[in-house]
């Protein structure tokens, strides 16, 4: 059957939309006369079976969601790639498709860089800290690096699709998680409050204030009375206002006693007073709705099943022969013929030469490597800062946040040094689980990161127990990561200002003779895996254009 389909496809050069004709022809050739209904059923089965087989045999051309089509061959050219993270491996992955010989030097004993999921037997040793080895139960993990894929990061999703990495929904926004304001004053301070309560109360009070102001013509807006009334009606609906435009309790913010069977109608909780919300600090920047309104954090979001570093691991499997692990670069030198790099592996000094180098090493690390780059590039490397950030994974013997508090995924926000608690978006209803006990930034990350590994755990448990008193009884194991103290990273992601985008950033977009730069720090997608993927493609296009003397700009297609 596949042979017959192949002949038909090759003769008529049909594509997927013409498979009904193929089904008709082949069915007539090999099947006895059948009814229309039976024919349609069997045609569908035929198409479903034949199409994947024809794709595998190269009889039909697939239609990639984010194609990257470059012409010409890189045969005979050697590209050296520094860094085995997503940007480095993606560069090698695309270049090898074009025939280039690639070599990746990775300083760590693993690939992925900051795309790292901590699971059983994962290890790290930070600067001035003891070695940690994760003792999580088999199958449990947390993403120490990137943990979310926005739905509009189509290139990231494209590579998940192309590489066969399954994804699942990541629950970034959960109204059932908590706000916790430590300090402040009044009845809402030092008390966990469901996010939905604060959101609905603040929305209701602000809608009430604006509706009253419009009614009393205290708002300077150029609109007719009819339009003003439409705005007021919108505010009534949006804020849950009554007929008098007053915010009263509604089911939106939850129940004291939930509805049930028979006479159990449920008891609606009274709204918190606006003054109490303010005095507790629950309208401070720590509790702004950034997680909902920021473009990159809007639902739907995804994560790779089994850990985000499965993306990196799948790339590694395709590139095993070109990756050298434990190779710490000490020198990068542009030469007349190409580039020469010195590195240390197994306590031995080694040297490698190539036609072109793609450097994906994070800038704080690159700043400590000898090189002969231009002054502009050197300044960019030395002066672009990276964010200080850290996480801790806490394993509990029972998923009490689900069982006791009905929190399934999402984030609890605090104003203390925990900053955020992330609940896992996988293995719902399982017995055990690992949540991220803190995810902090800047000064808070520096403060917590300076603690010993044991004291980080103690801090996370003590502060976390203020929100979840089940912590002490249910806790089992922990593993913490401070990226600004992690060798070969020295920070979470690059931070640019408007001014540095015009100077330092521009310098890194151009090759320094035979050295090209890639990584999230060479995009406007810093902190995201999409930045690594986009930068890799841009750099591959630039390198290939140079090697084949073509004019190529990225993106190369409209997809």
Which sequence ranges carry the predicted segments?
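Active-site/ligand-binding neighborhood in enzyme catalytic cores
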Residues: 176, 183, 207-328, 335-338, ...
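Short glycine/proline-rich turn/loop motifs
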Residues: 24-27, 71-73, 133-141, 287-300, ...
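Mid-domain catalytic core of redox enzymes
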Residues: 325-438, 467
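N-terminal secretory signal peptides
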Residues: 1-35
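Conserved flavin/dinucleotide-binding core of flavoenzymes
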Residues: 15, 26-29, 34, 42, ...
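N-terminal glycine-rich phosphate/pyrophosphate-binding loop and immediately adjacent elements
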Residues: 70-208, 557-558
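Active-site rim elements
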Residues: 139-150, 297-305, 377-385, 443-454, ...
């Amino acid at each position: 059957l596949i042979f017959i389909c192949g002949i038909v496809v090759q003769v008529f050069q049909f594509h997927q939309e013409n498979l009904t004709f193929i089904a008709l022809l082949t069915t007539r050739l090999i099947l006895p006369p059948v009814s229309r209904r039976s024919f349609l059923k069997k045609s569908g089965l035929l198409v479903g079976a034949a199409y994947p087989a024809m794709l595998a045999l190269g009889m039909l051309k697939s239609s990639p969601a984010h194609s990257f089509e470059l012409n010409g061959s890189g045969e005979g050219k050697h590209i050296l790639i520094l860094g085995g993270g997503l940007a480095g491996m993606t560069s090698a992955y695309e270049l090898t498709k074009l025939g280039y010989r690639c070599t990746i030097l990775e300083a760590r004993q693993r690939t992925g860089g900051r795309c790292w999921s901590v699971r059983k037997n994962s290890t790290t040793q930070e600067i001035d800290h003891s070695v940690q080895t994760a003792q999580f139960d088999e199958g449990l993990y947390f993403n120490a690096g990137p943990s979310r894929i926005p739905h509009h990061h189509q290139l990231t999703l494209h590579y998940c699709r192309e590489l066969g990495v399954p994804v699942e929904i990541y629950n970034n926004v959960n109204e059932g998680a908590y706000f916790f304001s430590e300090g402040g004053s009044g009845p809402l301070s030092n008390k966990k409050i469901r996010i939905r309560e604060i959101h609905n109360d603040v929305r209701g009070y602000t809608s009430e204030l604006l509706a009253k102001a419009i009614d009393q013509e205290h708002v300077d807006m150029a609109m007719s009375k009819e339009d003003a009334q439409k705005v007021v009606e919108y505010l009534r609906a949006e804020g849950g206002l009554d007929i008098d435009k007053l915010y009263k309790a509604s089911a939106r913010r939850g129940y004291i006693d939930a509805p049930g069977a028979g006479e159990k109608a449920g008891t609606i909780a009274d709204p918190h007073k606006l003054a109490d919300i303010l005095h507790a600090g629950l309208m401070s920047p720590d509790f702004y709705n950034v997680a909902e309104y920021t473009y990159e954090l809007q639902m739907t979001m995804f994560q790779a099943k089994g850990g985000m570093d499965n993306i990196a691991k799948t790339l590694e499997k395709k590139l095993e022969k070109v990756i050298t692990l434990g190779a710490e670069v000490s020198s990068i030198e542009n030469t007349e013929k190409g580039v020469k790099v010195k590195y240390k592996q197994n306590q031995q000094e080694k040297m490698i030469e190539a036609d072109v180098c793609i450097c994906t090493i994070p800038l704080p690390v690159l700043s400590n490597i000898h090189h002969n780059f231009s002054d502009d590039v050197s300044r960019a490397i030395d002066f672009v800062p990276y964010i200080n950030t850290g996480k801790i994974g806490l394993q509990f013997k029972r998923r009490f946040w689900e069982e006791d508090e009905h929190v399934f995924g999402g984030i609890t926000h605090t104003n203390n040094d925990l900053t955020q608690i992330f609940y896992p978006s996988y293995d719902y209803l399982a017995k055990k689980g690992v949540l991220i006990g803190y995810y902090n930034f800047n000064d808070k990350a520096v403060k917590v990161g300076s603690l010993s590994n044991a004291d980080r755990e103690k801090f996370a448990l003590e502060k976390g127990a203020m929100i979840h008193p089940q912590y002490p009884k249910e806790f089992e194991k922990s593993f913490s990561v401070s990226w600004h103290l992690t060798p070969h990273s020295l920070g979470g992601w690059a931070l640019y200002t408007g001014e540095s985008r015009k100077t330092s950033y521009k310098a890194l977009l151009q090759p320094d003779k035979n050295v090209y730069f890639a990584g999230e720090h060479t995009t406007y997608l810093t902190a995201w895996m999409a930045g690594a993927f986009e930068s890799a493609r841009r750099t591959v296009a630039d390198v290939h254009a140079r090697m084949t003397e073509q004019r190529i700009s990225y993106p190369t297609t409209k997809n």
